[in-house]
């Protein structure tokens, strides 16, 4: 069987600024991400991050990939997210940001704009894509809600059984 090779998406232009796209999924939530050079503003469905996510763990999940790559204050993030609940949406956004960052660093390293980390043989320096993958931001969490079965109360729970 032939191996499928995924090509990195080229940047899109929003106005005069270059933007990098990423898509993330978690449970039934789907997030579409645009990373634009800026000063660190994050807007989700045209609302600020602090207004959209009230839980600190959800905010940290969204900001995690940016802080790992040390790009928190250098990129603006525009997000459109649909479906799922709040935590599922946070996971989808996190994966989408990581994928967009991977595309951004992958294209920059391939073009020679930013030298590939670890290219000069420095021990302990890891490329961004590998760093994101090792941290788990690029991995799709495939856990979904299990369907309800007939003859049962839920997916696993059975109706009460009486022997006599």
Where are these regions (language model features)?
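Structured, basic alpha/beta domains of bacterial-type, RNA-associated proteins
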Residues: 2-25, 31-82, 87, 91, ...
